[in-house]
Amino acid sequence: MTLYPKLILDALATVRYPGTGKNLVEAEMVADNLRIDGMSVSFSLIFEKPTDPFMKSMIKAAETAIHTYVSPDVQVAIATESRQAARPEPGKLLPLVKNVIAVSSGKGGVGKSTVAANLAVALAKLGYKVGLLDADIFGPSVPKMFQVEDARPYAEQIDGRDLIVPIEKYGIKLLSIGFFVDPDQATLWRGGMASNALKQLIGDAAWGELDYFILDTPPGTSDIHLTLVQTLAITGAVIVSTPQQVALADARKGINMYTNDKVNVPILGLVENMSWFTPAELPENKYYLFGKEGCKQLAEEMNVPLLGQIPIVQSICENGDKGTPAALNEDSITGRAFIELAENVVKQTEKRNAE
C-alpha cells in the first residue's frame, strides 16, 4: 500500500473537535509539516493553548482514524503545537522581575496595605522600577489608595500571549482584583477560585522589567500565601504590626509561617506601624497609644531587623482616602518615615541577594 497526504487528511477529517462542529482539517488544526516515509506518518496538531483539555483525546482520536480509514499498519507520530505561547513554569513566571517582596501581617487592621502602598511609592521615588499587586483578593484596597477605582485594565497580545496591561500611577504598575469586580460587591469565592484569579494577575499580566514587585498579601495565613510562595520566587517578606501585644502575637505567627521549612521565605524585617501619635500642631510630641517599641522587642526576640517605625498622623488616613499616598510628600513626617523604610528594605534585599 502506498500512502499519500490526501489519505491521511481524509482520515483526520472524520475527527471533530468537541464543541466546534468542525473537524481537525476544517479547524486548521493539522500543521503543514505532514511527512510520509513508507508506512510511517508524522505531523503536528495545533491547539489554541498548550493546556488544551482535549489534547490527549484528540491525539488518540487522530491515531484511531488513520488506523481505521487508512491502515492499521501505519506507524503514527503526532506532535503538538499551540497558537498561544506556553506559560512559564512556576517560580519563573516573572523573569524580568529582580525582587519580589511580600508585605504581610498576622492580623487585619494594622495598616498592612497602607505600608505596602507607601513602600511602593517610596521605592519609586528612590528611582526603582516598581510594581504593586493587590493580592488581598477578598479585601482589595489598592484602587482606592491610588484613586484609580474607575480604571479598567485592558488585554494586549505580547509575544503571542494575551496579557493584562497593569494600570500605572505615580510611576508604579498596579493590578488588583478590585479593577474587575463591583466595589460594593463582596467577593464570595472558594480558596481555589481566589488562587486561580491571583495566578492570572501574576502570570497573565505584562509586568515587564521591575526592580521591585510588591505583594500586598491578605492578613493572617491562608491558601493565598501558599499560592504566592508556590507561584513566585519570593525574595523576602516584610511583616507589619502595631506595638500592641495582641498584634505582635499574630506577627510572630506570620514570621513562623514564612520561615517554615515548607515555605522557606526569608524575613527582610518588621515594620512597626502606628508606633506613636503625633498631632500636626505639635510635631515634636509623641503619644504611645498602643505601647512602646513592641516591634523592636519582637525583632530582637526573632532575630530579624526592624525596618522602620511609622507614626500615626492624621494625614496618612486622609491621603489614603484621597488616593495620594503619604510617601509622595518626602518633607512630611510620614513621608520621611516611608523613605527610610524603603531604604532599609533595599539594604536588606541586597544583603539577602548577596548571600
Label every PLM stretch briefly.
Residues 59-60, 211-212, 218-309, 314-318:
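Conserved catalytic-core segment of NTP-binding enzymes
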